[in-house]
């Protein structure tokens, strides 16, 4: 906190300057205030920095916000905007007006003409903020866009020209996932006319902890042609349904471990008609059995995934939201689809992928906003070099946060939660009851329906109505059951008479990560309103049972034994159990941080390769004369081929020519005995074939287009295999780590070897495609290249 005070001390000096400029801005006419933008741009061209013009620019936007929106940013909001400009994270509590804070930082950083973005976790927030704030930016002379198609336009084809217009706006609002996919597709474009992104400059990441921490390990993937799909998924699913849990397999629920018993193995061999389940020939069958068992035993519908319109969609463990477009890796997803009897999605090869940490590392300056970033301050600093600065609230927080109640069983916990809702509902006090999963939200809903308590349910099934449900959650008599997704987004404003009843009551019914708990508690008590939070947890909560130590499991079994003998054990208390659960949560959060750190280290390697590849690819697309590149490729390819093969035998050389140079018969001289002589002969032959192709080409530009198509096609085809290879290296890194050497070092070595091999493959396939491809022009006069 001392560091925060020092950082804010500097910011307060700037705030004083901004406040002193207030009367000057207030006295300006609309026309004069609007003219400030042109003045600032001129000052920047003359050598002033953004820091130099910050006080006057912020004072300008502040006054514009008042005139256009009727809202004048408070001092604490200006402090938040200063922190954002400095490339740090502003931690601001729920209801403190982060949306308005962004106007100042975005305006200032857009003045250089390089672009400024605000990226949100979901489309609703981006669309809402752009619609609300665009009038301010446009009034001040800046262009603003929403860089994705809204739901009503989602089926329309978006052209590169449209996207170019979006991303060339001074200020861009978009979602993190839209930006990730646009970046990947932009770098897979077949020509510069199909590209639309300019270099990334400045970004504010809204809900930065959700994007850079919770979603850090989820890669965004563009797929290419699918791998061959196995037909064993349905058969393995049928087999697993026949298994008897008493004799055919062992399932350790707490550890999520399972295996077939000797009886189960014998049953598998009979079912699949195998001599041995563990022979090399049966390896695929065994793998599919394990996948099917995992789908049935460890993947729970309503907890880990939902089936929406015939599609298996994963659920985010922390936010409770649907993770559309994301699959569990290595066949588990298809096994779940077989279990749910929906159409199997094809396992596809990855054409391109990127994670959020790698994406935002491409910006010159990154800042962020969140209500709960301080919990992970050290991780933000170490991983992203982002400082977290807590902005003081405008008025003190008076919410009452009660100590968690610990129950032995889930049923005791849920019945207490329902009783609490009933008591509060009698007074008319609104309640937000948070369930840990979709499954639990529906159980609680049924309990409330049975006793006649009207309520709304917010979970991944009806996320489309989130804004409306949350908007009404603070009204008198409102009871809202929600998953963790209620922790972010739209503010819950109190209705008439609710303050007098004690404000919104938040009741959590699961043990959650500390940051998620703070998010949910923060839904109550916004802007000095009264409110309360109370978390009810049980030793049967999935967060606890899946992370318990053997000692804690023994303690739980001991208590359950006593309860089964008639002893009344409902509430658990005392410092020992509280400390034990606190340590359990700390261990789990430390493990999550370690996993994110390892993923980020490995992703850095792919990021470097991706950046190098896209730079090379971009250069090829933007080069008007590729003859030198083609000359170099031919020379390097022949060197590589001659290093790998001995072509001194005439028949071997002829075979090589038919495979890599031309399908036509070629007279090969008898005197080619040295590598140099063979290389010179092959090089001369290669240029002769290229010259023959040029007769089909009308001019130098068309010849360059041919070179471009061949090189880009070779690069893209090999890049797909390279990404696939790096992913396999990443998966195997943990196993290699058992050798005693650091995982990240082993991963780095293997990835470097793979990249060197990848560059060689591009050279060789480009050589082959230059010479063996067929070219012609279609009826529109366009060049068509056919690769064999």
From Swiss-Prot:
Disulfide bonds: none annotated. It catalyses: ATP + H2O + cellular proteinSide 1 = ADP + phosphate + cellular proteinSide 2. Transmembrane segments: none annotated. The keyword ATP-binding applies. ATP binds at residues 77, 95-99, 491. It is found in: Cell membrane; Cytoplasm. It comes from the Bacteria. PROSITE patterns: SECA (PS01312), SECA_MOTOR_DEAD (PS51196). Pfam families: P-loop_SecA, SecA_DEAD, SecA_PP_bind, SecA_SW. Its EC number is 7.4.2.8. Belongs to the SecA family. Part of the Sec protein translocase complex. Interacts with the SecYEG preprotein conducting channel. Has a central role in coupling the hydrolysis of ATP to the transfer of proteins into and across the cell membrane, serving as an ATP-driven molecular motor driving the stepwise translocation of polypeptide chains across the membrane. This is Protein translocase subunit SecA 2.
């Amino acid at each position: 906190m001392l560091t925060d005070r020092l950082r804010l001390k500097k910011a307060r000096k700037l705030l004083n300057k901004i406040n002193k400029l207030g009367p000057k801005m207030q006295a300006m006419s609309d026309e004069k205030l609007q003219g400030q933008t042109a003045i600032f741009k001129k000052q920047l061209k003359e050598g002033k920095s953004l820091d130099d013009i910050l006080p006057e620019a912020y004072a300008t936007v502040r006054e514009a916000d008042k005139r256009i929106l009727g809202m004048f940013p408070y001092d604490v909001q200006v402090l938040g905007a200063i922190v954002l400009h400095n490339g740090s994270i502003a931690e601001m509590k729920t209801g403190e007006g982060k949306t308005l804070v962004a106007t100042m930082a975005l305006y200032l950083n857009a003045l250089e003409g390089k672009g400024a973005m605000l990226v949100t976790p979901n489309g609703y927030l981006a669309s809402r903020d752009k619609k609300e704030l665009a009038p301010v930016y446009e009034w001040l002379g800046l262009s603003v866009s929403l860089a994705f198609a809204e739901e009503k336009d989602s089926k329309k084809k978006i052209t590169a020209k449209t996207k170019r217009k979006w991303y060339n706006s001074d200020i861009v609002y978009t979602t993190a996932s839209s930006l990730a996919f646009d970046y990947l597709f932009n770098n897979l474009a077949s020509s510069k006319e199909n590209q639309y992104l300019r270099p990334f400059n400045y970004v504010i990441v809204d809900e930065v902890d959700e994007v850079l921490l919770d979603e850090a390990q989820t890669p965004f993937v563009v797929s290419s042609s699918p791998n061959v799909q196995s037909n064993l998924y349905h058969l393995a699913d049928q087999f697993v349904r026949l298994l008897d849990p008493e004799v055919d397999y062992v399932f350790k629920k707490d550890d999520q471990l399972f295996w077939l018993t000797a009886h189960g193995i014998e049953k598998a061999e009979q079912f699949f008609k195998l001599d041995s389940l563990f022979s090399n020939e049966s390896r695929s069958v065994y793998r599919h059995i394990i996948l099917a068992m995992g789908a049935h035993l460890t993947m729970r519908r309503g907890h880990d995934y939902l089936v929406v319109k015939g599609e298996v969609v994963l659920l985010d463990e922390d936010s409770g939201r649907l993770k559309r477009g994301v699959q569990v890796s290595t066949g588990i997803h298809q096994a779940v689809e077989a279990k749910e009897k929906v159409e199997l999605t094809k396992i596809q090869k990855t054409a391109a992928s990127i994670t959020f940490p790698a994406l935002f590392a491409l910006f010159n300056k990154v800042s962020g906003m969140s209500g709960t970033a301080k919990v992970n301050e050290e991780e933000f600093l170490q991983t992203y070099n982002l400082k977290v600065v807590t902005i003081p609230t405008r008025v003190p927080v008076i919410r009452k946060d009660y100590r968690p109640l610990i129950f032995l069983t889930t049923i005791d916990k849920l019945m207490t939660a329902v009783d609490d809702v009933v008591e509060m509902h009698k007074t008319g006090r609104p309640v937000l009851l948070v369930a840990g999963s979709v499954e639990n939200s529906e159980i609680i809903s049924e309990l409330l329906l049975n006793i006649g308590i009207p309520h709304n349910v917010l979970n991944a099934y009806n996320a489309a109505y989130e804004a409306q449900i949350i908007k009404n959650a603070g009204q008198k008599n409102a009871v809202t059951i929600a998953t963790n997704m209620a922790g972010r987004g739209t503010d819950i404003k109190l209705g008439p008479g609710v303050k007098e009843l004690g404000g919104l009551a938040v009741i959590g019914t699961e043990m959650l990560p500390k940051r998620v708990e703070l998010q949910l508690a923060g839904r109550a008590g916004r802007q000095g309103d009264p409110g309360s939070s109370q978390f009810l947890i049980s030793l049967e909560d999935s967060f606890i049972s899946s992370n318990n130590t053997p000692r804690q499991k023994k303690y739980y079994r001991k208590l359950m034994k006593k309860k089964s003998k008639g002893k009344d054990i409902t509430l658990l208390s005392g410092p020992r159990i509280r400390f034990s659960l606190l340590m359990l949560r700390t261990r789990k959060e430390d493990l999550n941080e370690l996993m994110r750190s390892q993923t980020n280290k490995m992703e850095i390697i792919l990021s470097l390769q991706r950046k190098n590849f896209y730079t090379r690819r971009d250069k090829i697309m933007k080069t008007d004369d590729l003859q030198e590149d083609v000359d170099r490729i031919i020379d390097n390819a022949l060197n590589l081929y001659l290093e790998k093969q001995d072509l001194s035998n005439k028949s071997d050389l002829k075979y090589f020519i038919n495979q890599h140079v031309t399908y036509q018969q070629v007279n090969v001289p008898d005197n080619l005995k040295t590598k140099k002589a063979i290389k010179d002969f092959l090089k001369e032959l290669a240029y002769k074939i290229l010259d023959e192709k040029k007769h089909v080409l009308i001019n130098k530009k068309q010849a360059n287009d041919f070179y471009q198509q061949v090189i880009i096609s070779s690069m893209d085809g090999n890049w797909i295999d390279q990404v696939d290879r790096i992913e396999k290296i990443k998966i195997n890194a943990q196993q290699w780590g058992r050798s005693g050497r650091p995982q990240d070092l082993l991963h780095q070595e293997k990835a470097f070897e793979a990249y060197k091999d990848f560059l060689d493959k591009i050279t060789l396939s480009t050589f082959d495609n230059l010479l063996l491809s067929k070219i012609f022009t279609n009826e529109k006069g366009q060049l068509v290249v056919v690769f064999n």
